[in-house]
Structure formats: C-alpha cells, structure tokens
Swiss-Prot record:
Name of the protein: HTH-type transcriptional activator AllS
Family: Belongs to the LysR transcriptional regulatory family.
Pfam short name (any one): LysR_substrate
Keyword tRNA processing listed: no
Gene that encodes it: allS
NCBIfam families, per the entry: PRK10094.1
C-alpha cells in the first residue's frame, strides 16, 4: 500500500495541488498519477483529496498522511545505506559523556560535524557531567566513550584509557576581596569566614567527590564552571579554578591567586572507552584523541600544553 512510488506520488500531488504538475515533477503521465492516488484511497478506505476542476486539496486525513509520508519515504530511501553501515560495523547510536572541565561548545560542534559527515545514520548523544558523574555514565548508563574521566586508571577492567593531561589549579578570589592582600599562606581560620564556591559532583551511583571546603565553612553550589568563575569575579566566594581558565583574569588583576595550607594537586584526566563491542565511530574518536588531531584540540585547551 505504502510503497516508495506511491508515497512519492502522494507527496507530489499534495505539494503541487495538481495531478498534472505532479506528473511533470515525476516524469509520469497524468493518468498514472490519478490512478495511483485512486488506488491509494481505495486501499486506505478514506478520501485523501478534495477535487475541483482547477486543483486538488488535502482532506484532514490527507494532511495527516502527508506528515507521516515524508518521514516514511525518507526512512525507506535511507534504509539501504543504514543497513550497509550496520553491516560495516558502524554503531546505530553513540553516547558520549564529557567532563565539565573539558566541555567546550565549539569543540563539541566541531567533533559532531566531523562525525556526522562520516556516519550520517548514527545517532549521537552528548552528555555533560561533573567529576565522578563521568565514570557513572560509563559504568551504569551505557555510554560508549568518555572525554575526561578522572584519573589514569580504569575503575573497571572492561575499559581502556588514554591520558589526556592534568589540570593545574589556582586558589582565587576577587581582587578586592578582604583576603586579597593578607599575608600568605592564609590560615584555615581566615578562609573559613568566607563561602567556598563549588560545582557539585553529578555522580548518581558512585560516591560523590567533595570539592574544596573546610569544616564549618559555608558552601555555595553552582551548576557549571561559567557560573563559578562569575561568582569569584563578583566576590561571592573563594575557591580553586583551573589555571588555564583564570590566568587572563589573574593577569588583568580581576582575580588574585593566594597560597593556602593545602593546595590542590593537579587533576589527571583521561579518555575512556569500552574494550569490547566498540564500533567504527568510537574507534575513530579514539584515534582522533590518541593522535591529537586538530578536530579535538578544543577539548585539550584546559591543559595548557597537552601531550603531543
């Protein structure tokens, strides 16, 4: 009933409002077009067009069918290529989770453009997670690959890792903050008087990592790095920021960096993917990162001088 030729004929008549114009578009005779529409209406048992001497217009049923017919025809026409892609070992869907520290909208768009050109029938799902939330997505939510898991050792032996680099940290506050000119190192008693601004770990199953905060100190939780930086600039609170993200603000004296009793060590981050069952799209992403290709350079900017 809904073979490709019938769908093309129905769509052409609906879009042109004329059997003769549809015939011209499809290089068929008007009689052929009219017969196919008549047969379609007989098979469905409903009138799809109102006919006049000058034009044909869709009935309510015809309007509904038109909405569906375009999708069906597109699906039928793409199916041979989709089947070939599956046969070649290409995934139907790839879920990618990205660490909040490495998340860069332009870098994500560039990677997706590269992938979509090569794998037009693969569905790509991008998620942004924080700290152990990245591992959580890999271990418990079926994600295929992670850009920026914490550490350089896998939490399960079913994953492979490639170290990407280490994030260097600076303890910062606004230039006009009351602690900005106090003698270093700042004491815990001095620090405890002011709120710590943090981004909460997004892990749902794994134990959340606790960001920097002293016992008894007020904590302000914000949703992302952009808000955390803005909060520090506004003098809302104190805390650690990646050096590469705050260096320009330190240079122009919007922020100041101070020494505290326990400085945050560098945070190593890695690419992680499943050892078994990965398809060609994931393999290509891994190659982009292991070869440090330009297509993924935006994800590595936070490291300053990423491994070459």
């Amino acid at each position: 009933m809904f073979d490709p030729e019938t769908l093309r004929t129905f769509i052409a008549v609906a879009e042109t409002g004329s059997f003769s114009k549809a015939a011209e578009r499809l290089c068929k005779t008007t009689a052929t077009i009219s017969y196919r529409i008549k047969l379609l209406e007989e098979n469905t048992g409903v009138a799809l067009f109102f006919r006049t001497t000058r034009s044909v217009t869709l009935t309510a049923a015809g309007e509904h069918l038109l909405c569906q017919a375009r999708d069906w025809l597109g699906w039928l026409e793409s199916m041979p290529s989709e089947l070939q892609q599956v046969n070649d070992g290409v995934e139907r869907q790839v879920n990618i989770v990205i660490n909040n520290l490495l998340y860069n909208p332009q870098a994500v768009a560039r990677l997706l453009a590269w992938l979509n050109e090569r794998y037009p029938f693969t569905q790509f799902h991008i998620s942004r997670q924080i700290y152990m939330g990245v591992w959580d997505s890999l271990l418990y939510e079926g994600f295929s690959l992670a850009i920026g898991v914490t550490g350089t050792e896998a939490l399960a032996n079913t994953f492979s890792l490639d170290p990407l680099g280490s994030v260097q940290w600076r303890f910062v506050m606004a230039a006009d903050h009351p602690l900005a000119n106090v003698e270093e190192p700042l004491t815990e008693a001095q620090l405890r008087r002011f709120p710590a601004v943090n981004i909460e770990d997004s892990a749902r199953t794994l134990t959340k990592r606790v960001a920097w905060r002293l016992p008894g100190q007020k904590e302000i939780i914000v949703p992302d790095m952009e808000t955390k930086i803005a909060a520090h600039l506004a003098g809302v609170g104190i805390g650690f920021l990646p050096k590469s993200l705050c260096q320009s603000m330190l240079d122009n004296q919007q922020l100041v960096s101070r020494v505290i009793p326990t400085m945050r060590p560098p945070s190593p981050l890695s690419l992680a993917w499943r050892k078994f069952g990965s398809g060609k799209a994931v393999e290509d992403i891994v190659t982009l990162f292991t070869q440090r290709r330009p297509e993924i350079s935006g994800f590595l900017e936070i490291f300053g001088n990423p491994r070459s």
